[in-house]
């Protein structure tokens, strides 16, 4: 985890800022320009990981079984995944890497299939609410914990951040936070860092 955090920081910035990872799991750290300072200790996928793939996968499953998902979306979700309760419980409680299994459902948010346009408003509203709740939760727990949060840019790493950029902007405004860079793949930023700071 420490190596991932350091890589994320150097992929995003060389200046002071807060760097957030939204991947299978989630994390954040404050970089003062020299040293990386982690946020709260992570207690893992079952207790934390706000706005991660694991978090959104769990939310989708809960909404499906609690009938909180729009009907047309629920039908497509059931078509795409094996939602047999015993299969889900086996993968979550008996198999290795349950966090990755849960995160695999999150791709549905950004690729819900060929759904009819007449359902677009309901579907987009559902996904907007789902994502914004996760992002707000992350901001409150993993960004505002740093006293520097309103003084430095907030950078994001990961596919979830990449596909949710507009929602992240909306969520940051009430907290008077400044959005920095959003990088889908950390390796892209690391290559740029290497070119600009190592090769020169």
Language model feature labels by segment:
Residues 11-18, 61-200:
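ATP-binding/phosphotransfer module of carbohydrate and carboxylate kinases, centering on a glycine-rich
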Residues 1-75:
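Phosphate-binding/catalytic loop of phosphoryl-transfer enzymes
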């Amino acid at each position: 985890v420490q190596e991932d955090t350091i890589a994320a920081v150097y992929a995003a910035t060389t200046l002071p800022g807060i760097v957030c990872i939204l991947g299978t799991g989630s994390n954040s750290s404050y970089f003062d320009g020299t040293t990386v300072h982690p946020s709260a200790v992570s207690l893992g996928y079952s207790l934390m990981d706000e706005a991660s793939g694991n978090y959104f996968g769990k939310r989708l499953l809960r909404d499906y079984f609690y009938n909180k998902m729009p009907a047309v979306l629920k039908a497509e979700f059931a078509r795409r995944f094996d939602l047999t309760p015993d299969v889900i419980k086996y993968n979550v409680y008996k198999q290795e890497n349950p966090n990755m299994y849960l995160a695999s459902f999150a791709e549905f948010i950004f690729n819900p299939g060929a759904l009819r346009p007449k359902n677009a408003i309901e579907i987009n509203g559902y996904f907007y609410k789902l994502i914004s709740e996760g992002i707000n939760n992350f901001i409150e727990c993993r960004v505002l914990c740093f006293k520097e949060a309103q003084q430095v840019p907030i950078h994001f790493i990961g596919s979830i951040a990449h596909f949710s950029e507009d929602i992240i902007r909306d969520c940051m405004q009430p907290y008077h936070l400044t959005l920095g860079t959003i990088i889908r793949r950390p390796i892209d930023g690391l290559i740029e860092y290497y070119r600009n700071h190592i090769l020169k």
